[in-house]
Amino acid sequence: SAARNTGICAAGGKYVIFLDSDDYWKDKNVLNKISKRLFETHPDVLCFNFEKTDGVTAQGVNFQSTGSMPVGIKAEDSFQYITEHDLWIACAWNKAIRRELFRDGKLRFREKITSEDIDWCLRLALLAESFDYIEDVIVCYRQRNTSISKSVTYQKVATLLDNIEFCVDVLDGVKSNERVELLKPYIAYQYGTLLANISAVPDKDQQKKLLGKAKAYKNFLAYSQNQKIRLLRIASRLVGLKGTIALLKLRERGKLYAGGRN
């Protein structure tokens, strides 16, 4: 986060793009593809596709069934299109962001935490006015066995829960903004990821503590049409959150969600 904030301060040009140190661009033409679309549609935020990889072998494209966003959709309708097609996800590096949005420090990343992209993407969604998406694979997202997304500790899960609480507080502080409703499915997905991670915490007392706090936000599951989240909602109604955690643990300790940035 500190490196990103430093880069934001040093950035020039009209748009800002992030790339994590262990990821890489798909090919040498990706910036041309981004630039061409930005010149055509002039959005505040352009989202793009990415490919998962272990560094050697491609593991599949993230958005497999959605083509590029049709040109001509009104700015006020663009975020609804993005959310209805499950294209708004918690990562900074699959987006090109108009640099003007970073003025006054409104889009600084919170430092010294994990999962910092979650609340940042929510704040970005509330701040930007127009959105676009291209189906081109721009980034190769590398998943290592030692990466944060492949390991679970109590502190990391607690930070994920704190991020969800932060997002809920942000939405509670927004008045008369229809985008709040559009962002509830986004929080629902983070909540589903939280449940999967809680199931992987080995210490039962720590798991119980996390689940006790997580119960306050279980109603967000009702806002998502994502198949995984709908299954969690059904399970929570049938066997409660504690039973849902047990089911996730049985299903390879929550691997249903491992690396699932969609």
Tell me what each language-model feature is:
Residues 136-144, 150-178, 193-197, 201-221:
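Catalytic core of nucleotide-sugar-dependent glycosyltransferases
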Residues 3, 21-131, 141-155, 175:
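Donor-binding/catalytic cores of nucleotide-activated saccharide
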